[in-house]
Amino acid sequence: MDTSVLNPELQIHGFIGVDSLQSSRKRKNDFDDFPLNKGLKTNNNDYSGSIEPKFSPALSIKEDGKNDRNFEALMSLQAQDSNLSEQNTSIHLDALASSSIALGNDNVDSSAFLSKVNKGVNAMRNSTSNQTNDSILISPSEITNMDPFLKGSARWTAEHWDYLERRMQNFCQTYSLDHTQVADSLHEKRLHGPLSSLVKLLVQEMPSFTRRTILRHLRALYNIPGYEKYSRKNSSGRGDFGVQETAIISQEVHNFIMDQGWSEYQFCNQIWAGKCPKTIRMFYSNLYKKLSHRDAKSIYHHVRRAYNPFEDRCVWSKEEDEELRKNVVEHGKCWTKIGRKMARMPNDCRDRWRDVVRFGDKLKRNAWSLEEETQLLQIVAELRNREDLSSDINWTLVAQMLGTRTRLQCRYKFQQLTKAASKFELQENVWLLERIYDSLLNNGGKIHWENIVKEANGRWTRDQMLFQFINLKKMIPSYDNLPLLEATKSAIDDFKVVLSGFSN
């Protein structure tokens, strides 16, 4: 096993005490990142159609009073790292029935390309006939003095997959679990017991990655729905770059900077130079031949994303937002020029402008109002009427028309509003319109959705009924010509005429 992905400080037994493990539970973002959950309020009824996660009793151990046992078992995992190095076995899949773990069989030699932690000091193992599995350890001072941009741009490589697979193999042996039980537990929105403690230990062992990144890849390892994009992939020629492709690029970059006598930071500056130097053009030409199944443009952009000299990737201060605003006024949307002036990725500048800065003080982060939701649905319906229904929705344009929410907020809210519900039949449309008519009549022309939701008895959420009402308004001509109350009464009468025809 390539233990260079670990923090060597943590290889000293006894370094992590029970107190430090308990204190790590106080970390923020202890929840995972299930798709669309962030920033959204979800109704328990919305999950009625989903698969009920089955948490194994073996993993539902109460943490109070049993932390010592969990910790001792986890420390034994660290103590057995040397044994794991000698075992090159993958997770056995015999115990799995319907869901199997997608383990890589791409046979990438993890010693053939640059390790993520060793990247900052240009350390590389030589591939020779008598090569061993001994890791190249970096002193704590070297880790501290690494270029700060490395952590933000860390790439998950074959070495990390190998290590994660072996960790899970040993974890299952320690707790006498099969991988089906682990997979069931990973369906839970929050981890418990020894599995939660293992994730916290992995966070300390792989400091280049956040807890969220580790959890995403762990769930992808066990084929949890929604995490397919993080799974271990071979070279496909499309989509995200696979493990083999990433390994080839890393090896080519290492060979190139060794030949040129550069540091990696110098290489990053060269590929981001205003005019691409001849040596860099030769590097790309050679790389295109190595990855001939890939489009040259996708390779070019992948290398620039993976190797860039910019330190900050996520956090923006108010001063930087104001600087970005001034640069857009001065240079327009020339993101390459703006990115060079601000020492940031051009795409980061573009996204920050598009998602935050251009809204100014109008941007809202609080809960959506009913008026905003209605306006969002109407905007999407209008755009779909203009364009082909099969085409993707332009969420940037939707956000621009709404004026108070970002494109991501609009997209997530629309998906929440239109999530799958029981289909409205003709009689149910009449039921819905009658409840809306009564609410309008009794509340001065206002719709009290909370009362209608109670009468629905959990069959539909407020969002689903609102979406259906907006669709009905588009279908029924009377809503274009009459006030809301009168149009609703007319629609009810029309539907009842149709129903009476069916009954006859």
UniProtKB/Swiss-Prot annotation:
CDD domains referenced in this protein's UniProt entry, alphabetically: SANT
Alphabetically ordered keywords of this record: DNA-binding, Nucleus, Repeat, Transcription, Transcription regulation
DNA-binding region in chain numbering: 335-357, 395-418
Coiled coil: none
Location of the protein in the cell: Nucleus
Domain HTH myb-type residue range list: 308-361, 362-422
GO BP annotation list: cis-acting DNA replication termination; positive regulation of transcription by RNA polymerase II; regulation of DNA-templated transcription; replication fork arrest; replication fork arrest at rDNA repeats; replication fork arrest involved in DNA replication termination; termination of RNA polymerase I transcription
Listed GO CC annotations: nucleolar peripheral inclusion body; nucleus; rDNA heterochromatin
Annotated protein name in UniProt: DNA-binding protein reb1
Lineage of producing organism: Eukaryota, Fungi, Dikarya, Ascomycota, Taphrinomycotina
